[in-house]
């Protein structure tokens, strides 16, 4: 029973630790690239479309209001 409990665990060597860290860095870079793609291809265009329409609506309303004031 003592032999079963006396397991030797090899410490992670520096090379394996660097590989693990490198894999984490690669995964993080991939995740950031995916987030950038989603923002650039989906979020920013939709936000720009929404804000552009809001701005155009308010600009058109102000122009019509000024036109009515000048006409009267």
UniProtKB/Swiss-Prot annotation:
Pfam families: Mim2 (PF19117). Component of the mitochondrial outer import machinery (MIM) complex that mediates transport of proteins into mitochondrial compartments. Promotes the insertion of tom70 into the outer mitochondrial membrane. Promotes the insertion of atg43 into the outer mitochondrial membrane. Involved in import of the subset of proteins with multiple alpha-helical transmembrane segments. One of its GO terms (cellular component) is MIM complex. One of its GO terms (biological process) is mitochondrial outer membrane translocase complex assembly. The keyword Protein transport applies. Residues 53-72 are mitochondrial intermembrane. The chain crosses the membrane at residues 35-52. It is found in: Mitochondrion outer membrane. PANTHER family: CHROMOSOME 1, WHOLE GENOME SHOTGUN SEQUENCE (PTHR28230), MITOCHONDRIAL IMPORT PROTEIN 2 (PTHR28230:SF1). Component of the mitochondrial outer import machinery (MIM) complex containing at least mim1 and mim2. Interacts with mim1. Interacts with mitophagy receptor atg43. This is Mitochondrial import protein 2. The lineage of its organism: Eukaryota, Fungi, Dikarya, Ascomycota, Taphrinomycotina. Its main location: mitochondrion. It comes from the Eukaryota.
